[in-house]
Design a protein with these regions (language model features):
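Selective transmembrane helix interface/packing segments
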Residues: 2-269
Length: 269
């Protein structure tokens, strides 16, 4: 089904691979207004609705002997709770930040995984707006954590570490300021964006090539069209890899958000 929905428009039988225009689909509703909605926006709405439905169905009738759906949901929640939140923040601080870190993980996962779902075929996190919003949420969380514990001394202590020689303070302060308050959110957003863009481009390339080989080259009687078997096999394998990447990037994003909170709460501040 990915093959059927690959972007394979051709001109005079030529092959056209993926392009950045995939990430700027035409408006569907409210064109030309601040509320313009395109295909990617609809995918994001769909992901939010599906996530809410999954958690509502999974928690409305909890049973002592759990169903398979309840087991799967509990496994996912316990994975995030133990392997990201508790292992990074500990029990006390973990309880305080459990909800936002879990929300970040499942939201990023849901947005990422649409890139391999037939007829959606593009990640909701593959344009810069959403990664920026998620990075800003993480930014607010770790700054809030630092201010909550240390007051506004948090900013001073973050850019002026203790024990630094006086002559090195200006250089160290600039480095710490940039790395803590600028590079953290920027790298969070760009890491997620670049992984999703690259994955989409490779998948579309594989399945576009497959359709071209089968329905253009082979249909004309040229047996070079059998190369489509190889591109299809590579696309199928890469689809599984993209599933792994979708989960991994959700884990990395949530883990780094928790790590930045932990650094803000560290006693050195």
């Amino acid at each position: 089904m990915l093959l059927l929905s690959a972007d394979t428009e051709t001109d005079s039988g030529g092959f056209h691979g993926p392009s950045l225009t995939d990430f700027y689909p035409p408006a569907i509703f409210f064109e030309g207004t601040p509320f313009e909605i395109n295909r990617i926006t609809l995918i994001r709405f769909l992901v939010v609705a599906v996530l809410l439905l999954i958690f509502w169905l999974g928690t409305r009738r909890m049973r002592v002997v759990p169903t398979r759906g309840q087991v799967a949901l509990e496994f996912a929640l316990n994975f995030v709770r133990q392997n990201i939140v508790i292992d990074t923040l500990g029990e006390k601080d973990g309880k305080r930040f459990m909800a936002p870190i879990m929300a970040i993980f499942f939201f990023v996962l849901g947005m990422n995984i649409t890139g391999i779902i037939p007829f959606l075929n593009i990640a909701g996190s593959s344009t810069i707006g959403l990664p920026i919003v998620l990075a800003l949420v993480s930014y607010v969380l770790f700054v809030y954590a630092g201010i909550k514990k240390f007051g506004f001394r948090y900013f001073k202590n973050s850019v002026v570490p203790s024990g630094v020689p006086v002559f090195a303070l200006p250089i160290v302060a600039v480095i710490e300021l940039v790395s803590t308050f600028i590079l953290r959110p920027v790298t969070l957003a760009l890491r997620l964006l670049m992984n999703m863009v690259a994955g989409h481009m490779l998948l579309v390339l594989c399945f576009s090539a497959t359709q071209f080989f089968f329905f253009t080259v082979l249909a004309d009687g040229n047996f070079l069209g059998l190369l489509g078997v190889g591109t299809f096999a590579f696309g199928a394998v890469f689809t599984l890899f993209e599933l792994f990447v979708a989960v991994l990037q959700a884990y990395v994003f949530a883990f780094l958000a928790a790590t930045y909170i932990q650094l803000s709460l560290a006693d050195e501040h």
